[in-house]
C-alpha cells in the first residue's frame, strides 16, 4: 500500500484537478506546476501513459477534514469511484438520473499523498459495493480506525478506485498540500477538470 515517500515543495496555493499529463514526464505540465517536477518524473504507473494530476494546496480549518463539505456523514469516508445503476464505475456519480460524464476502468489505480501527518486514513480493503458518488460514511462502523493505516507526511499510498480512505479532521488551522495521480483508464471529463494547454489534443 505504501510505496514511497516524497518531499513536498514550498506551499504557494497551487491547484489543479484531474489535469491530463504524460506520466513520468514533468515537461508535459505547465510552468506553474514545475515545482512538482521531481515528484512527477519519479512517480508513475506506466511511463509515457496518460495520467491525471490533482494538486490541492489549500488552507484547512481546525476540526474539519480536507474533503470538507463534500462529505455527507460525520466521517469523510469514501472510495474514489462511484457505482452507477448500469454497473459502471464513475467519477463523482451524482444522483439518480443525473448525467455521468466520466467513466473509469475497474483496474484504475491512484497514488495519494499529503504533507500533514495523520490526516488521511487508508484501509487495506476493496469496497466495490459503493454509492453513486463514492461516499460511504454511513458504513463507518465497518472501517474502525484501529484497522486503518494513517499516512505519515509525504508517504505515498497506492490504492484502487474502491479502496476505502478518509480525510481526517485537522487539529489546527494549517496549509495542507495534497497530490493525487490517477492512472490511465479514465474516459471523459467533467467541466471543472483542469485543462492542460500543452496537451490540447486531450480536450
Residue ranges and their predicted role:
Residues 1-51:
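N-terminal auxiliary "cap/dimerization" subdomain that precedes the catalytic jelly-roll/cupin core
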Residues 1-3, 11-14, 50, 66-68, ...:
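Sequence-level motif detector for i,i+2 pairs with an aromatic at +2
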Residues 34, 38-76:
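A basic- and aromatic-enriched beta-loop-alpha substructure that forms the phosphate/nucleotide-
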Residues 35-51, 81-82, 102-104, 150, ...:
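Secondary-structure boundary elements
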Residues 56-58, 74-76, 113-116, 160, ...:
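Structured loops at beta-to-helix junctions and adjacent beta-edge loops in soluble globular domains
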Residues 65-155, 189-192:
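Catalytic core of non-heme Fe(II) oxygenases with the double-stranded beta-helix
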Residues 137-203:
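Catalytic core of Fe(II)/2-oxoglutarate
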Amino acid at each position: 500500500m505504501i510505496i514511497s515517500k516524497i518531499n513536498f515543495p514550498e506551499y504557494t496555493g497551487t491547484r489543479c484537478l484531474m489535469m491530463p499529463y504524460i506520466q513520468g514526464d514533468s515537461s508535459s505540465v505547465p510552468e506553474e506546476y514545475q515545482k512538482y517536477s521531481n515528484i512527477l518524473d519519479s512517480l508513475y504507473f506506466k511511463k509515457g501513459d496518460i495520467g491525471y494530476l490533482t494538486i490541492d494546496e489549500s488552507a484547512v480549518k481546525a476540526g474539519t477534514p480536507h474533503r470538507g463539505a463534500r462529505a455527507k456523514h460525520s466521517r469523510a469516508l469514501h472510495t474514489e469511484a462511484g457505482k452507477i445503476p448500469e454497473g459502471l464505475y464513475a467519477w463523482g456519480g451524482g444522483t439518480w438520473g443525473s448525467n455521468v460524464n466520466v467513466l473509469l476502468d475497474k483496474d484504475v489505480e491512484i497514488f495519494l499523498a499529503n504533507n500533514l501527518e495523520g490526516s488521511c486514513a487508508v484501509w487495506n480493503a476493496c469496497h466495490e459495493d459503493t454509492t453513486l458518488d463514492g461516499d460511504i460514511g454511513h458504513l463507518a462502523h465497518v472501517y474502525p480506525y484501529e484497522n486503518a493505516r494513517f499516512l505519515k507526511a509525504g508517504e505515498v499510498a497506492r490504492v484502487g478506485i474502491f479502496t476505502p480512505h478518509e480525510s481526517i479532521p485537522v487539529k489546527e488551522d494549517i496549509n495542507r498540500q495534497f497530490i493525487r495521480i490517477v492512472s490511465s483508464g479514465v474516459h471523459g471529463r467533467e467541466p471543472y477538470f483542469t485543462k492542460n494547454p500543452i496537451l490540447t489534443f486531450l480536450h
